[in-house]
């Protein structure tokens, strides 16, 4: 029986490349001359620390980062940015978290959405991913289109498509 897995992963190497590109752009931009502004990617905690001298500049840096992530194939919705910007001394910063894996509440929404669609497929939660199996390849592709079209707050990838 054909099957595939629904996952939500961010390629850390591509994220590192996007952070490096954003840092290079900030160094060359006129509005960031003589300003302490930087990006730091922490691989262990999968966070990107955006640091600057004012909260307005932090928001500008976040826009630059989102644009660079999008160019590297990482959707902006995979970046979880908290609302409040932390002020410490003369710097402002925010720690944006890269979303890895699908949360259990989102997994349950996806499984319920698949079951409500009345397609002849089964969905099982397996750790951070969802395995979808069915008899017809067309039904599986319909599930893929339905999950892509849903607005659940994070991007999804489809892996291990087996016939």
From Swiss-Prot:
GO cellular component terms, semicolon-separated: cytosol
SUPFAM superfamilies the record matches: YajQ-like (SSF89963)
Signal peptide residue numbers: none
This protein's UniProt keywords: Nucleotide-binding
A Pfam family of this chain: DUF520
GO molecular function: nucleotide binding
Any coiled-coil regions, as ranges: none
Function per UniProt: Nucleotide-binding protein.
Sequence similarity: Belongs to the YajQ family.
Protein name: Nucleotide-binding protein YajQ
Source organism: Escherichia coli O81 (strain ED1a)
